[in-house]
From Swiss-Prot:
Lineage: Bacteria, Pseudomonadati, Pseudomonadota, Gammaproteobacteria, Alteromonadales
An annotated GO cellular component: cytoplasm
Enzyme class: ligase
GO MF, one example: ATP binding
Catalytic activity: N(2)-formyl-N(1)-(5-phospho-beta-D-ribosyl)glycinamide + L-glutamine + ATP + H2O = 2-formamido-N(1)-(5-O-phospho-beta-D-ribosyl)acetamidine + L-glutamate + ADP + phosphate + H(+)
Subunit annotation: Monomer.
PANTHER family noted in UniProt: PHOSPHORIBOSYLFORMYLGLYCINAMIDINE SYNTHASE (PTHR10099:SF1)
Gene, per the UniProt record: purL
GO annotation terms (biological process): 'de novo' IMP biosynthetic process
EC number(s) stated in the UniProt entry for this protein: 6.3.5.3
Protein name as annotated: Phosphoribosylformylglycinamidine synthase
Amino acid sequence: MEIIRGAPALSAFRVQKLMEACENAALPVSQIYAEYVHLASLSEPLDDNERLQLETILTYGPAIESHAPQGTLLFVTPRPGTISPWSSKATDIAHNCGLGKVSRLERGIAYYVEASVLTAEQQKLLQGLLHDRMVEVMLPAFEAAEVLFARTEPAKFSSVNILAEGRRALEVANIKLGLALADDEIDYLIENFVRLKRNPNDIELMMFAQANSEHCRHKIFNADWTIDGEVQLKSLFKMIKNTFEVTPDYVLSAYKDNAAVMTGSVAGRFFPDPDGIYNYHTEPMHILMKVETHNHPTAISPYPGAATGSGGEIRDEGATGRGSKPKAGLSGFTVSNLKIPGFVQPWEGDYGKPDRIVTPLEIMLEGPLGGAAFNNEFGRPAITGYFRTYEQLVSSHNGVEVRGYHKPIMIAGGLGNIREDHVQKGEITIGAKLIVLGGPAMNIGLGGGAASSMASGQSSEDLDFASVQRENPEMERRCQEVIDRCWQLGDTNPIQFIHDVGAGGLSNAFPELVNDADRGGVFNLRNVPSDEPGMSPLEIWCNESQERYVLSVAPENLQQFADICARERAPFAVVGEATAEMHLTLADSHFNNKPIDLPLEVLLGKAPKMSRDVVTAKAVSPALDQTKIELKDAVKRILTLPTVADKTFLITIGDRSVTGLVNRDQMVGPWQVPVADCAVTASSYDSYCGEAMSMGERTPLALLDFDASARMAVAESIMNIAGTDIGSFKRIKLSANWMSPAGHPGEDAGLYQAVKAIGEDLCPELGITIPVGKDSMSMKTAWEDNGTQKTVTSPMSLVITAFGVVQDIRKTVTPQLRSDKGDSALLMLDLSNGQNRLGGSCLAQVYSELGDIAPTLDKTANLAGFFEVMQQLVADQAVMAYHDRSDGGLFTTLVEMAFAGNTGLTIDLASLSGTDLERLFNEEIGAVIQVSAIDAKAIAAQFEAKGVTCHHIGGLQTADKISINDGERVIFADSRTALRTLWSETTYRMQALRDNPECAREEYELKQQADAPGLTVKLGFNPSEDVAAPYILKGVAPKMAILREQGVNSHVEMAAAFDRAGFESRDVHMSDILSGRISLEEFQGLVACGGFSYGDVLGAGEGWAKSILFNDRARDEFSRFFERDSSIALGVCNGCQMLSNLKEIIPGSEHWPRFVRNRSERFEARFSLVEVQQNPSVFFEGMVGSRMPIAVSHGEGLVEFANAQALANAEASGTIALRYVDGHGQIATQYPENPNGSANGLTGICTTDGRVTIMMPHPERVFRTVANSWHPDNWGEDSPWMRMFRNARVKIG
């Protein structure tokens, strides 16, 4: 093992945060210094040249001053027996650079701590601050890291001797292995193995436990029910299926695959043909939808828990039918009170928690980063979601107890597209090859299905830790590229059948694969790719290593599939063959035995069916005491409640523009305020049809009324999607995610009541189907605190996600109030017809009360009538702004609309009944719309005719003021800016804790500027003019290489932009260059695309660049291309970072900077203003002086020059192409207008001759106007950024 010292690991502010944490923990630490240490396992020694090459590869990242280490060494590495994602990707880079002697690279962090003598307890506290024991260990010395590369002999399986010891043996194994088997399941297993006349092996028991866990089998939803002594006719699942039986319209697949599928629009799907040339393919683009939860792992270790939750849901989408394409995602979190240090709120008590789970604050600081990072690296925009905090001592169905979310809800979901012929799974032919696609097996994530099926605290701490997985999104991206290549082949798609690998690992995935196709399988254990030879058969077969799929391919198509995998560098292995007999055999060639030899019917067939015999409990809770509430204090509390408050800290960490198909993300208007009701995507680059997603959840209401909570969740999801052009309820489908503390008094009967309310009543009445969903039935946390038993039990929690087909995405209405549209009126639409129920409201919560009566949707017809009228108004473009009433009531609805429009309001509530608090803060179903003053009366009449009460409540004012009156009486008045400051303080506090606090402060101060102009556009050209048209008419399309490396994810939208400009866009993978299949000699242009090549390990774009510089063939190809006078090249984001590291072979680029970690030290996804500078770039001809917004999505965009003189030389060269500017057109120096902290706002630069340009922002994602988060009304189909690509076409001639 070679030990290679690296760069400092922590910036100054990260060291400061660590020192503050030590101080808060009363640790006598005076100084901490940290640096990376690289560990190289070698097959044979390196020569001097190879060593120098390896050291060069391992030199990356920003230039932070290092110094001689002093103090006690604490060396943190990944846990032995695991391989970190960093390791696999860094090793890939080394191999692609020709360093075949490097068996594996790994990285640790060496902390050097100067401190007084620490007690054993203090040492434990310090180690807890420096590493995550879920995924890391603390080693005493560098040499001890040899354990990371240790290779042990394979372990054997063990048997449980039930034949001799009977039931007791299985009961002991049940506890030891964490199987969570019920008594009747133990009886079932004993009966079957006695019949088979043999003892079960541990691997068989684990496989059975995972496949039959509540997590996988949904026993409660399939159970027989008796409630209050009365036998119920339907199971929960049958009531959900009732929605499909009543309204099967437009549903193509439900209840049987990894995701549901609904009929989509016909549009031009854009992808490369087998020859690599991108083309449009006009066909139905059906919509798949899925929403998952990953609650248990997120409670234990939030970052990997949320990351793998997102990754698993993405795999579900990709493994639908015979392979499909994930498109856009969503996320949601529900946790107990945050108790932000220095910002603890009056309603946030301190009830404690078990040691094995993290705090709600830690979940929300780390979990969203994990989910966002996976989506970012995979290349899926996350464009809607929700966040709720709730933890309260309440009187509910079970008397007075603490209800909350110590076991959090972590929601991951999304939609995708699938070809018509691939919606249904194919036939697995006898003899078909059964394949695992993706990364290797590792000894992680054991027993996750069973563990997540237990209440937090029931399993042992070791088993909790074992059930957490690790994420590698770049590997999943490679697998998805393989799936894409397969479905793009249409009729010749080699995939017959596909499933993702999730809970239970291969032990669940392979049996499910063959069983669903009425086949059996013969498998060879040693064919499973594994980087840990010492694993037992149980560990190999049952681990939940991520980023894996199982699929079947006919033998005659195996070579075709293998070639696709080789090009995409996606590992795969043939593990077995399909058999006619439905029997499962797993052979172990190492020990020459069969760890599994079972009929599939024992594993999956007739396990005992659950019965639930439960009683109903009624909640008794006093009414909210309004007498003690002062309105101004209520406003302050409501606006700082995380459920209501600004959620920027959850949004800007996630890429919202990748694919170039996002029409509506969370950020609204020129001031980019996060208040959007729904997410909208375009079907394709050549259409205006699309898809929409929205969410609805009102979980605290279930503490008063289960029925109301469910009805309100469905209604809210509809209200949130109503501002899009959908047309009919039948074009909306719902996902229902049910969370419940099953077995808790009153909760089982309440769950049945809630399912019945929407499955038998509401949804059938509306004509809406629920074709997909998920349940999590163990939402309770139990622990002992100094001899006292404590529990925190969640409310029954239904999270609804609505998916809709959009007819015209241009007609979507947002909450942005328009002060530039002439006289207008605000109409309040009340579907409750004047009721003001405050039970379960945010107002009650912030005063530590629950209230007595929950709001509900009393009349289904009101929602149906509202939607009908609203859809007609949207289609007619008669509504200027729209926002629903929900958490925080009418007051929140109004101020959020004012924030988005940067306008004042004059409101009169005289026509509304109730107290001031009731009128402003009730959360009955409703909405506010802004319409033309001339049309207001007629529009109001349309709603009234459908039974919806409509109030004219006022309009806009130019002053920075929110005035709310009751006739002549002033109810409330304050400046909009003061309210925005309150609303944004929660996100500021979270950002300051998590990110660079200086950046957080600058953003918070910007939000307090009443006169901030927002995004302002100034164009020096007509974007509708097609300067390339004369050249396109010549009929010859110049060839553009759309270059990607493994992990790149922005190539399709780049190809579409160049295709529109008249180029022949061709898909070129780096493996094509390295293998010699393709030469750059064929191309007039090259574009290096954005994404996460090699997951950005070894520096963003640096690994990609070094794989070119250290490979003779690649270096020659690129050198010749750049030296050719007629060639042009563009590098965007990751491609920009990569090309900046090729300066030595790009003429005229000597003055280019490197691009390193953003000043915020956070991935930044923003819609930022840039201005085109005077420069020679061929791409910016005729655009100089133009100021336009553009998508920004990167973690390493800060320009780094060698010194101040190098920056001055670059400025003097005249090659600066783009700068970030503020709304006044001045160079942006403050965050987030300058999102990465680059000197002088620099974000684009070109060579001295202008042929090669690199830039960090993404013009390819916004070349269509509809793909911009905001744009002026007068823009046509093409945004101004389309001019860049047309300029390139003009240059080629």
